[in-house]
Structures are given as C-alpha cells and as structure tokens.
C-alpha cells in the first residue's frame, strides 16, 4: 500500500544498489573499475596489472607494488605517487556510505507504519541521517576524483549517481516531516478553539434534558398472527414510476371527440322486408351525448322522450279503436287526447265513410267541439313525441302523399317536431323503452296526429348544446329522410362543399327551402273541411328565409319602388346577369321575384332565431294582430349595387381551408353547461301568457265541453270546474 514514505524508500534502495556495486569493484569484481590507466585497473580494496593478469591482495590502501608498476607513468596523474598511496586508504569511505544508505533505507521502510509516520521526531531522525548519508556519499565521490583524475572509470560515476539519489531522499524526508508538523499544528489550533472543535456544541447538547421515552405496553407475540417475528414483509411499499411518454400539456384540447354527433350510423339489414336502413340503438345511459343529465328514456340522439299514449297506459279501454281515452267515439278522426287527459278532440262525428275498427261511425263532418280539458294524469313531458300512425282512410284509399293501401306510414310533422325527416318504419323509442309487446291492434289504421302549433312547445334549456345536421339545420336525424346530395352545383356556384362543411350545408339547405324526400307541403295535409275552432290545430307557417318575399311586400306597398331600388336587394353572388334579370322581372307564385337556386349567398342567421315573414302567416289566431310588413329599408339612392359585386367581395359561403368563415357559423360547445339560474341575470321563468278571449268564450260554452268519462272501469270523478286548455295552445297539456 502506498504511503507518504514510499518514494523515500524507493530512492534509498536505488542509491544503496549503486554504492554496493562501487564497493564490489576491482580486485573483487575485475570488471568494475574505479579508474584505469596503461593496463592497470583500480578498485576500492586493491588493483590489477597487465590487464587483470595479476592483482594485489584485498586490503585498505595500495602498497608499494603499484608505484613500481607505474614508475615511468606516475607523471601522468595529477597527484604524485606518494600522495596517491596515502589517499588510497580513504577509499574505505565507499563501504561506509553504502552502509549508511542501507540504514536510511530501513528507516524509510519503518516510516510506512502509523506510529513512525505520525511521529515528527522519527521523521526528523530520518532527515538527519539522510543529510549525513549525503555527506558521506559526496566524500566517496571526491576521493575517486582525487585519486583517478584524469583516468576515472565508470565505477566512480556510479558513486555520483548514488550521491544524487541520497540527496533527493533527504528532500522527501524533509517534506514528510513538514507535512506532519503542519497537520499537528492545525489540529492543535482547532483544539484550542472551543467553537471550532465543537466542544461548546457538545456541552450544550449535554445540558438539554431529553424527555423520557414512554413505555408502551407490549403486545404478546402469537405465532402466525402478529409480531415482527412472523412478519417478513417489508415495512414500506416500493413503487416503480415510469416516465410519461407524452405530457398532458402537449395534448391538444380537441384531441378527444366530445360526443358522437351522428349516432344513427346506417347499415343494410337483409332481414328487413323493406330493405331500408336500420337505426342502431345504443344502451341507455345517465347522460346524453352532450353530457347533460337525463331523467327519462332517451332516443338515439340523447333527447328525452316520453312513451306514447298507448305505451303509457296499455290497460286503458278502447285505445285507438274508436274510443280513445274519453267516451266511446262514433266516428271522426279523433282518437283521444294526448296522455294526461281523457277528453277527445270534440264530439263524435256523424256519418262518413263507414264504421272504423271497433267503432260505430265513420268519417263524418268535422267535429263541433273544442278540446277537452285535462282530467286525470299530468301533461306530457317536454319533448314528447306523439304517436305517428297511418290514417284510417288508408283502408279506403291513400290520401295524398301516403303510401299504398293498408301500409302504415308515419305522419310527417313540422320541422321542429322530433320525428321530422325520420323513416316511417323506424320504431319509436317509447315503445322500445317500455317494452310494449306487439299486438294485433297495433296494425289497425289510425288518424294522423296533428302537430303542436308553433310557440306551444316547451323552450329548450338555455345553454344546452344542440348539434346541427349537415342538411337540415335541425337536430340530427337519419340521412335517409332527405334526398341524396346531387352532383356539384347543388348549392350553386360550381363549388362542391366538403364533408367538413357540415354546418354550412345545413344552413344553406334550410335557407334554400330544401325539404325532406317523400313529404308533401304542409298545405296538403288537411283534406277535409275545417271549422272555425279547428284552426287551432293548424300548423304554423313554415320557416321562410329572411328577405325572400320583401320584393312582394315592396310591390304591394305604395312608394316602395322609390325607397329601395331593385339593384340594391341582395342577389346570389355567382348568378349571371341573365339570371339576375330573370329573377327581378319574373314573379314567382307568391308575386315575389323568383330567387335563383344556384346562389351561394345565404343569410347568416340560425333558423330557429330567424323571424318568419309576416306575409306568409296563415289565418291569424283570433285575438292576435294580423301580419305586419317590415319597415322599408331606406338606402341612399347612389349606394353601391351589391348584385354587381364579384365573387370574393363578401364573406365567402364556404372555405377551402377552414370549416368556419365567421363567428356565427361556429358550432356550439357541446360540453358547456350553464350555471344555476340564480347566478345568471336575465334568465328566469318564462312569463305566463295572458288568456285569450276566444279561449275563454269557448271554455264557457257547454257545446265545446267534453262529457265526462262514461263506462270507465270503476268510474272517474267528473271534471273539476275551472279547468281549461293552456292559452294559445292547441293541446290540452295542463291546467292554467
């Protein structure tokens, strides 16, 4: 093991070897001379003449024979022969130098131990011996120089090398001692300083009283039950943590799809007789596709639906076989009120096409009664979808827009109805949700259900997300309810919408009047004579794009030509000049100029927020003001002609790079839920509508009162006085 004294030992070992070689010179080893001249070799203990043919005995100093041998050659040495013979005795210094070097080498070996190496005195002795050894070695070399100059041999130079090594060993011994002394002096200074030595710290620690340890009761050790003897499990749990491959901060917010916006993925089912697409059904969950909690059963779009009248009360008598939920009917289209009441749509009709299933009358004149007030039960839940069944007239001939005889089809509803655009063969959610079994009575024809009037449907919750369909602009419905998308130029302009422009296609489809395939206009639904009270069941005006009939109103308004110039009306951007002239000069069926269907220009207004044109409203409900013409738009006479603007001057209808071109075209965040009503100023319960005078008159007229239930099982209490239908509504959905 290396120690600080190791270099010292190495140097002294080398010096001792060199001095030993010089001592063993001629005549002991004839090959090692200290000096050589005219065939005579010199050593420490004698000499040899005639090329080592004859040697002197081993002794200290040279005898008289050397002088005789060098009688004629003595003048060639620097010293006379007598002086050289006297100095030859000093050659004994070579063995002394070797001996001192050996002693110093032994001391250096002892300095490798702990006690001598940490003793300043021992190292001091080593250093002193080293100095003495250096002096002796130096003296031996000087004797060689004096005796043999200028005929020195290589043996004398070995003594010089040994002298140098002894000097270096003395320096090493001095350094060792100096290091040790400095270390001890520093330690002494530290011991004298109480703060540096830590004495004060330990004194303070000793003064602090340690609280006695509490003796906890020992629990007896039971083999296999408790105790550290049988518990060989580690006292702590170790876990391995893997580095995340991707940080959450680097994941885009739109990486996860919020919901399946089109759950009705269509596929062919070979088991279906009609060969149409099936509607897949997902398992019910506690939330809809937008994350909003639901209380009742939902359809495939996550919209809450309530069961139909027959599904909610399968044990009721009559059903739609002529009796409904009220008294036995004697004909007419009425099949009973919606769920929650027991009155019909009026008194039974008389006469008509003949008896219906289980009924005693046929298709008679229109009923003369009003709507029966609600009796037992409650109003249908919001979003209730009335049962859509075929009309009894199918047995006698299909009405306009219906299928072949005996085939049941779903009665088309308004665009706002939940069943809009859906296949007639699609099963309802209410029947699937309540597990109603198919009975023979389900195949019987039934009169169509009038849709609710506009404004009577419950307002959707504020803040609920609504996904717009790509073609209709309404909540998504199966795609088979619309005609297939034609080749490019469907929306005009020679530009095809991409698949990502779903919202734009839906808005353009609504504003250009594209209707679902296979359905007829609302004006063709009612084929019978309607009485004055029956106007309550008429459908509201269909949505008409804004500014479509302004030209018609302008033509009927005196001075309209002077207010708005025809060139200043919005025209399609990609329409040619010929199309513009035709659209301005050729009046349509309603007297308004015909709009070009090749236009890409559309109003950037959501359909449900657009105000219908007053000119297209039907007969106004009694008690309400008639249609009003919007005020004229006073534009400067010399204003720019928007029809003359080339493509690209306005906001484009579609974009090649981005799905959205303006803020109004951006979709609604499907995951946004509004705060409680108490935290949203301006949002509160809708004000109650004032009762209509005509409704009050009809309710007070006994001719429009429905009789109480007759023949019901167990009977039922008579209708409570004071009940009436909701003002402004065509359905007896609840109490006022």
Curated annotation (Swiss-Prot):
Residues in compartment: Extracellular: 30-89, 144-151
Residue ranges with Polar residues bias: 201-210, 254-269, 473-482, 513-540, 573-586, 656-667
Cellular compartments annotated: Cell membrane
Pfam family name, one: SUR7
Record-stated family: Belongs to the palI/RIM9 family.
Membrane topology: Multi-pass membrane protein
Keyword terms, alphabetized: Cell membrane, Membrane, Transmembrane, Transmembrane helix
UniProt topological domain (Cytoplasmic) ranges: 1-8, 111-122, 173-736
Main location: membrane
Membrane recorded as keyword: yes
A cellular component annotation (GO) from this entry: plasma membrane
Name of the protein in question: pH-response regulator protein palI/RIM9
Stretches the record annotates as Disordered: 201-226, 240-500, 513-736
Summary of the function given for this chain in its UniProt record: Required for the proteolytic cleavage of the transcription factor RIM101 in response to alkaline ambient pH.
Gene it is expressed from: RIM9
Organism, as annotated: Pyricularia oryzae (strain 70-15 / ATCC MYA-4617 / FGSC 8958) (Rice blast fungus)
Domain of life: Eukaryota
Compositionally biased spans, kind Pro residues: 448-461
Biased composition (Basic and acidic residues): 240-251
Sequence intervals crossing the membrane: 9-29, 90-110, 123-143, 152-172
Stretches with biased composition (Gly residues): 316-363
